[in-house]
Curated annotation (Swiss-Prot):
GO terms for cellular component: cytosolic small ribosomal subunit. This is Small ribosomal subunit protein uS15. CDD domains: Ribosomal_S15p_S13e. GO terms for biological process: translation. One of its GO terms (molecular function) is structural constituent of ribosome. The keyword Zinc does not apply. It holds the Pfam family Ribosomal_S13_N. Keywords: Ribonucleoprotein, Ribosomal protein. The keyword Ribonucleoprotein applies. PROSITE patterns: RIBOSOMAL_S15.
Length: 148
């Protein structure tokens, strides 16, 4: 699949595990792992970080083999949903980082251009989540003020 703001194809460097069988090397039971995932979600840990912890600490390469579904869907089904989805939150954070950089380095044209690209992607994702009712219809990102 092509990237949004470049001519590259965006091939991923990682490969999903081929086998979809249940991992036999787990030391914890499935219920303990599920309760740990719910606890991490309650603490505010984003779903990608939960997946990284499952991979590094428990040896689970693919969370859907143990949980039966994706981490995000599992958390939604158990009532642990973040107010703002992780991808939108990271885009807002990236836009704020660029804006604070531009407050210091006002003539950085490359950063200005990247801010335009990140902002357009952020508003596009926000429109999608408003349509899907994941965020309120009047949601606006909390952005850093740009000095003139």
């Amino acid at each position: 699949m092509a990237k949004m703001h470049s001519s590259g194809k965006g091939r991923s460097g990682s490969v999903k595990p081929y086998a979809t069988a249940f991992p036999t090397w787990l030391t914890k039971s499935v219920d303990e792992i599920k309760s740990d995932v719910i606890q991490m979600g309650n603490k505010g840990v984003p779903a990608p970080d939960i997946g990284t912890r499952l991979r590094d600490e428990y040896g689970i390469g693919k969370a859907s083999d143990v949980l039966g579904e994706s981490i995000t869907r599992f958390l939604q089904r158990n009532g642990v949903v973040p107010k703002i989805p992780h991808d939108l939150e990271s885009l807002v954070h990236r836009a704020n980082t660029l804006r604070s950089h531009l407050n210091i380095y006002r003539k950085d044209n490359s950063a200005k251009y990247r801010l335009i690209l990140v902002s357009s992607r952020m508003y596009r994702v926000a429109r999608y989540y408003k349509r899907k009712m994941r965020i309120p219809g009047n949601w606006k990102p909390k952005l850093v003020e740009l000095n003139k």
